[in-house]
């Protein structure tokens, strides 16, 4: 476990034993003074918590204790790289981490922030486990296949996943992450997030999670903020629009950012996005 200090925040990282006995790596950023609330950040496919250091710093600087972890098979956590036999394993990881954060931040209101595939993990977690949350924030959530994924390909994915679960099929186009060249370059050089396609089973489980969320989206009743860039080619903005319409939440908001690519938190207007999230969080605490 390590911990570093900055003038206004404290940051650190460590690890704990996750469901099934694997090692799960975690990160945290806390304000030096008493935190107003806690935020848990859930990253996406082939992603990891350390890439959100600037996000953790931002929220800690605005009074929010921020916690992130590397999903199994991602970042510095144990597990076969980017492989998951069932999406419920990611949900189990998050469930364990939420309990851990609640122990560290007793009595604090808790928000969940899920990005990309992490948005699907967070959404399914809320639907299945019914946690006591102050609100849910979804950044470019993976809720519906993109236009280039045909119904035939979706059907075939189940067959490929069954017989060739580790076949490399799910590729992430790094150039579609952001307009910022430095973000693309950093992603290319990141040894924890390489350009190797993810396994077929993982891709199929993501598609299955999308369907499960669509089937139960009307059960969402907690405050929810959904954000998507209209230029996103990695996750479908239509999925965010549909979730906004179908969610039963009385307190729900959809924000579309014209022309922005997939990583809203690593984009040309990332400060605006962070300000929008912070304002939304602040308003839920009043």
Regions found by a protein language model. Give the residues of each.
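Alpha/beta-hydrolase-fold enzymes
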Residues: 115-198
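Conserved alpha/beta-hydrolase
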Residues: 56-79
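Short alpha-helix in the alpha/beta-hydrolase fold that links the catalytic acid
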Residues: 222, 236-245
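Alpha/beta-hydrolase fold nucleophile elbow
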Residues: 105-115
């Amino acid at each position: 476990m390590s911990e570093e200090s900055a003038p206004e925040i404290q940051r650190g990282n460590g690890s704990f034993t996750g469901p099934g006995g694997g090692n799960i790596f975690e990160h945290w950023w806390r304000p030096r003074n008493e935190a107003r609330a806690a935020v848990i950040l859930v990253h996406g496919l082939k992603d990891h918590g350390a890439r959100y250091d600037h996000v953790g710093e931002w929220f800690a600087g605005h009074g929010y204790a921020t916690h992130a972890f590397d999903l199994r098979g991602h970042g510095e956590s144990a597990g076969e790289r980017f492989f998951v036999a069932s999406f419920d394993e990611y949900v189990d990881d998050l469930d364990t981490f939420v309990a851990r954060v609640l122990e560290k931040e007793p009595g604090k209101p808790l928000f969940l922030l899920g990005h990309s595939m992490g948005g699907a993990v967070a959404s399914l977690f809320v639907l299945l486990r019914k946690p006591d949350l102050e609100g849910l924030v979804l950044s470019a959530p993976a809720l519906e296949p993109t236009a280039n994924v045909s119904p035939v390909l979706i059907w075939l994915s189940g067959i490929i996943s069954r017989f060739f679960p580790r076949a490399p099929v799910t590729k992430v186009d790094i150039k579609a992450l952001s307009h910022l060249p430095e973000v693309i370059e950093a992603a290319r050089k990141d040894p924890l997030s390489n350009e190797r396609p993810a396994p077929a089973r993982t891709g199929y489980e993501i598609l299955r999670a999308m369907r499960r969320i669509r089937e139960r989206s009307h059960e969402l009743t907690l405050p929810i903020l959904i954000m998507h860039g209209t230029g996103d080619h990695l996750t479908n903005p239509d999925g965010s629009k549909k979730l906004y319409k179908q969610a039963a939440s009385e307190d729900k908001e959809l924000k579309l950012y014209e022309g922005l690519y997939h990583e809203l938190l690593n984009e040309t207007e990332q400060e605006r996005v962070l300000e929008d999230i912070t304002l939304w969080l602040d308003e839920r605490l009043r």
